[in-house]
């Protein structure tokens, strides 16, 4: 029997397909099962237009058979089958797709749903098999043919016997190597797990004879093994069902079954979209962040399916980083089953779907914030930081998308509020959105810098995440209202500032002396316009705040980053009389006062004192 050569550029092209397109050997089973599903689809479609062909869904299935002794794995379908010409054209030509041709011929007709669109999937069998045999009989013929190949050297076709239409693919599994354990593909557990992973939602039963145990009839204390014909796939994807047919319990069970999380999701988003690009999405907002969410080990992405067949387990291109917490999947008939990860990055249809997913997630979160505030607060406590990182990253390019989703603790409401809610409550004479940054709400509440803002009846937002101020610097303003830190040199209170300047000028020599004593640690010493009951505090001049300095100093090579600090003195506090007296009569004591007040201000800000021993000695000395 003559060996025929592949019509394509045999070895080089076949090697390219096996080694480049498919880097993961286990997907060979996904490819062959998808081809089998296509064959049954074709038979169904033919039955609609050809009265000679009957289609009873119960008679159509895919069977997997593993023979460990002979090291063969067989995939059988009861589909349309192939003629000799079909075998020649579809299997003899690498990258020729019978499914693609069939779809092209019938593209004007509705209901044609063929998974495979490139003829490379079948050849993935050679990743795990030395010898591949295809036995097929077409529904249009009484004759059957056997196609056999050992790889790049070519193939043979000959007549054979087969009682019923359909196709049987027999793989002679390779011998194990040091790097690869090929015989695992003959293991029942492995086959079961691969079918569950990749082909669970193929719409025809995938059957396999599986080993079971049961009590013996004559002795129920002993067990015996028996074989059972088991269907391994669930067949109907939940995301393709009508939402009206499903309960939240169905979604929750699916979420847990897929191991998306260990507790029920906070929000479920189920969409069926038809149009230029058709797709189904089933997305979940987790109730809490995974343990590794804020680490480099966390991998974002949605499961990606083509007609119920998994293409990729984690498709990161479907989610922007700021929505990386979303779990779930996308299924589209418009995506090729055999597209590589590299090509997906440039796929227009995928980009379109990703854009729509982003818009949908934002819309659902906004709705949740408005109509289900309790759960939105839970969500924000888990993932709000990620949204803030989204505002800060990429030079603020995503701020318009995310600003309405942000929440911060309010000094007046004593709970998390949105920026829109804050602005809606602003007083008529209020120019800025005021905020204060610190380690916790409790510590911020006690900050002396907040006194004057609170006295004017203005609401203050509390920033307790490291990223908060960085994000706000990118946001700059919200609804034309600029953000202003309560620690900023200029709070925008003109009358108070005028009085402060007058006090500073009257005590210029005193403040200049204190600044000199502090030897470059502060940019300025001045009379405070913001302090009411407290004696001293620090404010900052410029864009870098004291809290931002603390954050940056925790990063490598940022030890020299410093905010421009201003030491503010409450000239109405009784301690100021002691300072003025010391300036007049005891400059050495004033030096201790200056150092002491500066260190007190550092402690208020949560900053370390440079010389704790000297600080303690100064306190003791002044107590004499």
Curated annotation (Swiss-Prot):
InterPro entries reported for this sequence: HATPase_C_sf, Heat_shock_protein_90_CS, HSP90_C, Hsp90_fam, Hsp90_N, Ribosomal_Su5_D2-typ_SF
Record region (A): 1-341
Classification via Gene3D superfamilies: 3.30.230.80, 3.40.50.11260, Heat shock protein 90, C-terminal domain (1.20.120.790), Histidine kinase-like ATPase, C-terminal domain (3.30.565.10)
Similarity remark: Belongs to the heat shock protein 90 family.
Organism name: Clostridium acetobutylicum (strain ATCC 824 / DSM 792 / JCM 1419 / IAM 19013 / LMG 5710 / NBRC 13948 / NRRL B-527 / VKM B-1787 / 2291 / W)
KW Lyase (keyword) present: no
Subunit structure: Homodimer.
SUPFAM superfamilies linked to this entry: ATPase domain of HSP90 chaperone/DNA topoisomerase II/histidine kinase, HSP90 C-terminal domain, Ribosomal protein S5 domain 2-like
Pfam families: HATPase_c_3, HSP90
Single GO molecular function: ATP binding
Alphabetical UniProt keywords: ATP-binding, Chaperone, Cytoplasm, Nucleotide-binding, Stress response
Chain segments carrying region B: 342-550
Region of interest: C: 551-624
GO cellular component, one term: cytoplasm
Function: Molecular chaperone. Has ATPase activity.
Protein name: Chaperone protein HtpG
Protein's cellular compartments: Cytoplasm
Superkingdom of the source species: Bacteria
């Amino acid at each position: 029997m003559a060996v025929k050569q592949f019509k394509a550029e045999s070895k080089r092209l076949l090697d390219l397909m096996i080694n480049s397109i498919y880097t993961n050997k286990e997907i060979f089973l996904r490819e062959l099962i998808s081809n089998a599903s296509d064959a049954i689809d074709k038979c169904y479609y033919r039955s609609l237009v050809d009265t000679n062909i009957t289609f009873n869904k119960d008679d159509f299935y895919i069977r997997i058979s593993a023979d460990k002794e002979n090291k063969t794995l067989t995939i059988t379908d009861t589909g349309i089958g192939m003629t000799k010409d079909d075998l020649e054209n579809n299997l003899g030509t690498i990258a020729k797709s019978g499914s693609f041709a069939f779809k092209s011929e019938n593209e004007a007709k509705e209901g044609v749903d063929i998974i495979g669109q490139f003829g490379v999937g079948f050849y993935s069998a050679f990743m795990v098999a030395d010898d591949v045999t295809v036995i097929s009989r077409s529904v249009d013929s009484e004759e059957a043919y056997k196609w056999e190949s050992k790889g790049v050297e070519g193939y043979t076709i000959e007549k054979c016997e087969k009682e019923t239409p359909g196709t049987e693919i027999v793989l002679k599994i390779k011998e194990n190597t040091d790097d690869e354990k090929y015989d695992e593909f003959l293991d029942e557990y492995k086959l079961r797990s691969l079918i569950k992973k990749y082909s669970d939602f193929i719409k025809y039963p995938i059957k396999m004879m599986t080993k079971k145990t049961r009590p013996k009839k004559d002795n129920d204390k002993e067990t015996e093994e028996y074989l059972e014909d088991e269907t391994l796939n669930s067949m109907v994807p939940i995301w393709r069902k009508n939402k009206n047919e499903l309960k939240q319990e169905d979604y929750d069970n699916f979420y847990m079954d897929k191991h998306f999380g260990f507790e029920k999701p906070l929000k479920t988003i189920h969409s069926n979209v038809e149009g230029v690009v058709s797709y189904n999405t089933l997305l979940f907002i987790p109730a809490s962040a995974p343990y590794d969410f804020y680490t480099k080990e966390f991998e974002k992405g949605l499961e990606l399916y083509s007609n119920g067949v998994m293409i990729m387990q984690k498709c990161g291109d479907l989610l922007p980083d700021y929505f990386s917490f979303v779990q779930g999947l996308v299924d589209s008939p418009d995506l090729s089953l055999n597209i590589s990860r590299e090509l997906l990055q440039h796929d227009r249809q995928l980009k379109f779907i990703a854009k729509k997913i982003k818009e949908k997630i934002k819309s659902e979160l906004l709705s949740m914030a408005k109509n289900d505030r309790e759960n939105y607060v839970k969500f924000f406590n888990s993932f709000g930081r990620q949204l803030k990182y989204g505002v800060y990253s990429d030079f603020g390019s995503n701020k318009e998308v995310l600003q309405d989703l942000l929440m911060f603790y309010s000094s007046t409401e004593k709970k998390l509020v949105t920026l829109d809610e804050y602005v809606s409550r602003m007083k008529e004479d209020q120019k800025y959105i005021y905020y204060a940054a610190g380690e916790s709400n409790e510590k911020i509440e006690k900050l002396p810098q907040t006194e004057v803002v609170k006295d004017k009846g203005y609401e203050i937002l509390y920033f307790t995440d490291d990223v908060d101020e960085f994000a706000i610097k990118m946001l700059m303003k919200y609804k034309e209202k600029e953000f202003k830190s309560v620690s900023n040199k200029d709070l925008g209170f003109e009358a108070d500032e005028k009085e402060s300047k007058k006090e500073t000028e009257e005590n210029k020599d005193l403040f200049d002396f204190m600044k000199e004593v502090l030897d470059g640690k502060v940019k300025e010493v001045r009379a405070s316009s913001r302090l009411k009951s407290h004696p001293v505090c620090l404010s900052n001049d410029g864009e870098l705040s004291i809290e931002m300095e603390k954050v940056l100093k925790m990063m490598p090579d940022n030890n020299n980053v410093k905010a421009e600090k201003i030491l503010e003195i409450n000239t109405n506090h009784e301690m100021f009389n002691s300072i003025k007296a010391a300036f007049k009569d005891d400059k050495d004591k004033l030096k201790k006062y200056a150092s002491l007040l500066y260190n007190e201000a550092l402690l208020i800000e949560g900053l370390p004192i440079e010389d704790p021993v000297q600080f303690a000695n100064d306190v003791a000395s002044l107590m004499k």
